[in-house]
Amino acid sequence: MKRQLALGTNNLNKVKEVSSILMELGIQILTPKDLKVSFNPEETGSTFKENALIKAKELFYLTKIPSIADDSGICVSALKDEPGVYSARFGGPELNDEGRALLLLEKLKGNQNRKAYYACAIAYVDESTEQSFEGRCEGLISEEYDRIGIYGFGYDPIFIFPPLQKPFSQIQEETKNSVSHRKKALDELLKFLKTKP
């Protein structure tokens, strides 16, 4: 039987990204929907790591299947690392991904400091273990929203990846998945999972 991990997200883009990266270990990823559980934990942590652990613990409690969850976001130097853990809620619940990205551009208007990084913390929880892994991807915030790119989600249309000098929204998934903050955290998780029976 395939090894199974429950993934604490309802975001299909994250499911796809995590599944493609963990495929090499032959791990079957199960979502809350697959497991028919209602999963909507309150993210009350002040760090990505705390929020990831809240989600992984909740999912393990509901399913009793070894669980992973991530919390990630974008941190902008000129905004004192905001929106940070509030990235998905930045600007309020009425904004979608594009609205949040445009609001971020508005807040940076005229600011020369465009440094930013994507951060990701992934937590693993089972009956005897609580572990977390972190990754970062450094970049810059663009001057305008990219309407050409067809890849990615969230803040990808305004996040410039310096080695390729283009926004994540113009970088194919395989390439992005090899350099992303989530990939770096998942690589650490992979190392850990290889040591677990």
Swiss-Prot record:
Cofactor needs: Mg(2+)
A GO biological process held by the record: nucleotide metabolic process
GO molecular function: dITP diphosphatase activity; ITP diphosphatase activity; metal ion binding; nucleoside triphosphate diphosphatase activity; nucleotide binding; ribonucleoside triphosphate phosphatase activity; XTP diphosphatase activity
Keywords assigned: Hydrolase, Magnesium, Metal-binding, Nucleotide metabolism, Nucleotide-binding
The protein's name: dITP/XTP pyrophosphatase
Enzyme class: hydrolase
Function, in words: Pyrophosphatase that catalyzes the hydrolysis of nucleoside triphosphates to their monophosphate derivatives, with a high preference for the non-canonical purine nucleotides XTP (xanthosine triphosphate), dITP (deoxyinosine triphosphate) and ITP. Seems to function as a house-cleaning enzyme that removes non-canonical purine nucleotides from the nucleotide pool, thus preventing their incorporation into DNA/RNA and avoiding chromosomal lesions.
Cofactor note: Binds 1 Mg(2+) ion per subunit.
PANTHER family assigned: INOSINE TRIPHOSPHATE PYROPHOSPHATASE, INOSINE TRIPHOSPHATE PYROPHOSPHATASE/HAM1 PROTEIN
HAMAP family on file: Non_canon_purine_NTPase (MF_01405)
Active site (UniProt): D71
Gene3D superfamilies xrefs: 3.90.950.10
Residues given in the record as substrate binding sites: T9, N10, N11, L12, N13, K14, S72, F153, G154, Y155, D156, K176, H181, R182
Entry superkingdom: Bacteria
InterPro entries to which the protein is assigned, alphabetical: dITP/XTP_pyrophosphatase, ITPase-like_fam, RdgB/HAM1
Residue numbers binding Mg(2+): E42, D71
